[in-house]
Amino acid sequence: MASLGSYAKKHKVTIIGSGNWGSTIAKIVAESTREHKDVFEEDVQMWVFEEKVTIPKDSPYYESEEPQKLTEVINKHHENVKYLPGIKLPSNIIANPSLTDAVRDSSVLVFNLPHEFLGKVCQQLNGHIVPFARGISCIKGVDVSGSGINLFCEVIGEKLGIYCGALSGANVASQIAAEEGVSETTIAYDPPPIDSSRAATPRDRSPNYDSTSANKLPDLTVTSADSNGKDDRGRRTKAKLTPVPESYPPLDHGTLQILFDRPYFSVSMVSDVAGVSLSGALKNIVALAAGFVDGKGWGSNVQSAVIRVGLAEMLKFAREFFGESVDPFTILLESAGVADVITSCISGRNFRCASMAVKRGVSVAEIEEKELNGQKLQGTSTAKEVNSLLKARGREGDYPLFTTVNEILEGKARVDDLPKLVIRQKHTIEKSG
């Protein structure tokens, strides 16, 4: 267990994002910082995109009919009444409408916001974070540009010049926040060698990185491998990393474990950042397929076959585009892998919306518009991104499940075509084996 010991300073933590999952993570972290005051500053900043909320008359927080600022409601009543209602938040969570003020002097940045806002947020953060900050991305999805694919933790690291790991798992935010039983998650963090002897040994990774996209990122000073080492796929890191000062506790597996682990939220630490990140993104495509099957009422036999095919394509995709950097056991054994797939294919939002679409005889896009107020599912955006990459690489035929799900979403294929994937996938595996 990490301990401050002779360290003169403590880590300050900021949660960037305050939605359902962001508020849940803030709750977890704030409980831990309160218990481990020798390692962390007790107060946890949570950046909130300011908006007005109307408190219902039957609410114990009702004061007037006038809309109130969400940050003021959270700080006064310690509850995110809009995105995590009914859950009491620790009083040491400070809701802050100013992004730059929220991250001031923070050495641990936890990113938990819709991926479409990440670029703008990183742009606003430039020049406002301490140079030795480290990040954890809770954002599920991938960033595809042309024939290359980037992880969101890579985007964060490149844009801000910091190292960033990833958190993902079989996590239903409302259940975790309510402390219903014990949930689990996986945190992938491979400390850069510049952080003293605390670092894990970097592993070689695939060169399948989109250099075109990378060139759009800020120019960062290249340093020697001896100081910064390699990034999440073995390339010489472009960012000039600043080591965590020796006056702070090390930011390693032990420190992150006590920051995120709770009696109701079990954390497994690994170094496979690519495997954890990809699992969190690709499982949403599989969940859509499972939802289509459920909507058809085809039963558990077809359901299990589709999930198996989905796992096979997830593993194949990860190894093809990220090479030896991905540990198969991350996908097959960790919460971020198979457990998240199972949960998403039983009760996840992508699953439920896909099933609803089939039962109503409408498109998933119509469900998004009517049931989600126009908000896009993670699965639909990821399916489109992944298909764009596969098409650019001429690899659509080698990923029949991923391809057919996207074609169903675009109205180019029927849900009835899904069972054929089992045979097609078997042939694909045999040909590539």
UniProtKB/Swiss-Prot annotation:
Pfam family name, one: NAD_Gly3P_dh_C
PROSITE patterns on file: NAD_G3PDH
InterPro entries from the UniProt entry: 6-PGluconate_DH-like_C_sf, 6PGD_dom2, G3P_DH_NAD-dep, G3P_DH_NAD-dep_C, G3P_DH_NAD-dep_N, NAD(P)-bd_dom_sf
Any single GO BP term: glycerol-3-phosphate catabolic process
Entry annotation: catalytic residues: K283 (proton acceptor)
Keyword Transferase on entry: no
Superkingdom, taxonomy of origin: Eukaryota
Keyword Acetylation applies: no
Region called Disordered, residue ranges: 187-246
Entry binding sites for NAD(+): G17, S18, G19, N20, W21, G22, F49, F117, A173, R349, Q378
UniProt keyword list: NAD, Oxidoreductase
Molecular function GO terms recorded: glycerol-3-phosphate dehydrogenase (NAD+) activity; NAD binding
Binding site residues for substrate: K140, R349, N350
EC number: 1.1.1.8
Family indicated by similarity: Belongs to the NAD-dependent glycerol-3-phosphate dehydrogenase family.
Name of the protein: Glycerol-3-phosphate dehydrogenase [NAD(+)]
Protein species of origin: Pyricularia oryzae (strain 70-15 / ATCC MYA-4617 / FGSC 8958)
